[in-house]
Amino acid sequence: RRQRQMCIRDRLKRDIEGYKKTTQDDLINMQTGLFGYKGRVHFQVAPCLNDDLKELDRSLPKPDLFARISACIDRHIHCNYQIYPGNYVAYDWLNGTTEFVSNYTEEEKQQFMNYIEQQLAKIKIPNKDEDFLREKLLLMYSNPLVNYLAACR
């Protein structure tokens, strides 16, 4: 449901000039995130960041220092992502490649493709732009892999 809401919001932003997300949108997204289906869940704690933080130049202007601290935290989060077959399939499907084909089976690929099509079928809006919505779903599923690769290479 959360993916559908995000896709619909992206379409609204694209199609309606000046569209702004409302407080109600945030509440619905939080509710969906808390109570919705989770699929596979991976929880991991990264090593202590103190050594990395000690390396930062404390004389930087605060906005720059905070940006570097945020980047450090993001890097640790992204490097600890658990990447699943669906993330690899989404990346290859979105980009028209087979770059990560060794990371999933044909059965896993078909399961994920069916899942995406089922999610699209649940979206009930007039003049549904399935290509646009599919792209948004694939972006959501491929982004963890993109972030992981950017942080850990």
Predicted segments, located by residue:
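Long, charge-rich alpha-helical interaction segments
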Residues: 9-39, 44, 66, 75, ...
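Short, small-residue-biased leader/transition segments that mark boundaries at the very start
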Residues: 3-8
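Long, low-complexity C-terminal extensions of enzymes
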Residues: 65, 77-153
